[in-house]
Structures are given as structure tokens and as C-alpha cells.
A protein has these predicted regions:
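Conserved N-terminal Rossmann-fold NAD(P) cofactor-binding segment
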Residues: 3-36, 59, 65-112, 120-126
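Conserved N-terminal Rossmann-fold NAD(P)-binding element of oxidoreductases
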Residues: 38-41
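Hydrophobic/small residue at the entry helix of a nucleotide-binding pocket
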Residues: 45
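Residues that form or flank phosphate/diphosphate-binding pockets in enzymes
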Residues: 48, 109, 158
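Gly/Ala-rich phosphate-binding loop of Rossmann-like dinucleotide-binding domains
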Residues: 50, 54-55
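Redox-cofactor binding/interface segments in oxidoreductases and associated redox assembly factors
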Residues: 114-116, 151
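Rossmann-like NAD(P)(H) cofactor-binding subdomain of soluble oxidoreductases
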Residues: 121-158
Length: 158
């Protein structure tokens, strides 16, 4: 019985080591810009999230359905009053690590991580998931085996 338990522990330890190495490799590849991060929605959740990734050294693709938001982002600006977001956008643009796409499918094709940060507005106490569904449909067209999709929508309080 102890031998079986020892073999199980050895196998579990090997798996843990493999996972840690894999995660370390992901971090390295993100910081090198090999694995791009697409942030869908550059509003109250998406703009600060994109800025955090940019400050960490990642290459980020910003996507927003609003042309005004995209134009601002291409100038290194945002309408979100969060500290350091504009600075991160400007630095990312200068270092060619931040780009803004008009085409959400192209952003999906060009990225490894897809972060969905679109609003889920309440209508009659019901969430409206139309924006999420639209983004998911676009991502699906450009999705590749192994890609990671994270749903982090902004929701109203209450």
C-alpha cells in the first residue's frame, strides 16, 4: 500500500513540475510578445486590464465596437479615468506592443489569450448578453486549438 501511495505521489509531483514549467514558459512567451492578448472592450474593465498587461510587458490588441473608443486608443488615450492607463497605452504604442483592431475576428486569429470585457447591461432586471454573444461569435471564427478565452464582463451593481 505504501509503495502504491509513493508511486502516486511521484506521479503527482511530476505533473506539478510539468504544470509549473508550462506556466513559466507561458509567462516568458507573453513577456516576449510571442503570445498576444486580445482585450475585447476598452471600457471600465477592458482599458485598465489592457494597461496592466502592457505594463507587464505583454503585446496587447485592443478591440472595441465604438469607433470613437478605437480612435482614442490609437492615440494612446482612453475615456476611463483610471490612473496610468493612458501612459500604458502610449508606451505600448511607442514600443509596438499595443495595437487597436477594427476587426474582432482578425484579433482572435492574431492572439492567444482573448479577454472579453464587454458590458452586460440589465434590462428589466435581466442581463442582456447580446454584446457577449457577438464577441464570442467573432472569437470563435478566429479561435485556434489551445487558445484561452476569459469572460470578464462589466456588470451593473446590484
Amino acid at each position: 500500500m505504501d509503495r502504491k501511495r509513493s508511486e502516486d505521489n511521484t506521479h503527482e509531483n511530476a505533473q506539478s513540475v510539468h504544470r509549473v514549467k508550462y506556466l513559466q514558459e507561458l509567462v516568458t512567451r507573453v513577456r516576449r510578445g510571442d503570445l498576444k492578448i486580445a482585450v475585447y472592450g476598452l471600457g471600465h474593465v477592458g482599458a485598465p486590464l489592457a494597461a496592466v498587461w502592457l505594463r507587464a510587458g505583454a503585446s496587447v490588441i485592443g478591440i472595441d465596437k465604438s469607433e470613437k473608443v478605437r480612435v482614442y486608443a490609437k492615440e494612446g488615450k482612453t475615456q476611463i479615468p483610471e490612473p496610468h492607463v493612458n501612459e500604458a497605452f502610449v508606451k505600448g504604442l511607442k514600443e509596438n506592443r499595443f495595437s487597436v483592431y477594427d476587426d474582432p475576428v482578425a484579433a482572435s486569429k492574431d492572439s492567444f489569450f482573448k479577454m472579453i470585457c464587454v458590458p452586460v447591461m440589465a434590462e428589466n432586471a435581466q442581463a442582456n448578453l447580446q454584446a457577449v454573444e457577438n464577441v464570442v461569435s467573432s472569437i470563435g471564427v478566429g479561435l485556434k486549438l489551445g487558445d484561452v478565452v476569459a469572460l470578464t464582463p462589466s456588470v451593473p451593481p446590484g
